[in-house]
A protein has these predicted regions:
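Hydrophobic alpha-helical transmembrane segments
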Residues: 52-67, 102-115, 138-150, 173-180
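Helix-loop-helix units of permease transmembrane domains in multi-pass membrane transporters
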Residues: 127-165
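Secretory targeting signals
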Residues: 92-123, 158-181
Length: 181
């Protein structure tokens, strides 16, 4: 069916582009955090010899490390912040939330491999599965298959196997990204 090929092609393109963009974003964020952490380490060590308590009051920024799998699903990283200011006798909140800098749509919808696998692929499978059965019924093929002795369960299992293969093909870019990371 042409719809299966279309959904497979679009799904693979979307999943591959999401994986590539997420990997590039992860690399950029790691580089920026490493540079900021290095600068902060230099500032901390450059404060000279002090009483340790006074040095603790001087404060230091610490940066949350990014795990490798954050390329596939960053989680709440964009909403909770990336760094925190540590100082003695005071508890500070996380700072520098990337979602606060983005546009409204960017706060809610970020194209990640996780979004493709958790939302878009299942929706495509539901629509394709419905379309498969509806098209067979409208063309009169379902009764013809039943007259040839094919049980309805076997027909449904065959359609389910096609959809499962399609879902696995759509998950392939994310699985390759996990293997490469």
């Amino acid at each position: 069916d042409w719809r299966v090929a279309l959904v497979l092609a679009l799904g693979l393109a979307l999943a591959a582009s999401a994986a590539l963009l997420a990997a590039l974003d992860l690399d950029r964020a790691r580089t920026a955090r490493a540079a900021a952490a290095s600068a902060e380490q230099g500032r901390w060590t450059g404060q000279g010899s002090k009483n340790p308590h006074s040095a603790a009051h001087y404060g230091v920024y610490v940066f949350k490390p990014l795990p490798t799998l954050a390329a596939l699903d960053p989680g709440v990283e964009h909403y909770v912040g990336t760094s925190v200011w540590l100082e003695a006798h005071k508890q500070n909140d996380m700072a520098y939330r990337p979602a606060a800098d983005g546009a409204g749509a960017d706060r809610q919808f970020r194209l990640t491999p996780a979004l493709v696998l958790q939302v878009l692929a299942p929706a495509a499978m539901i629509f394709l599965g419905f379309g498969m059965f509806a098209a067979e019924r409208e063309r009169g093929m379902l009764p013809a298959l039943r007259l040839n002795g094919a049980p309805l369960g076997a027909i449904a299992a065959a359609r389910g196997a096609v959809l499962l293969c399609l879902a696995l093909a759509m998950a392939l870019p994310a699985l390759l990204a996990i293997a490469l990371l």
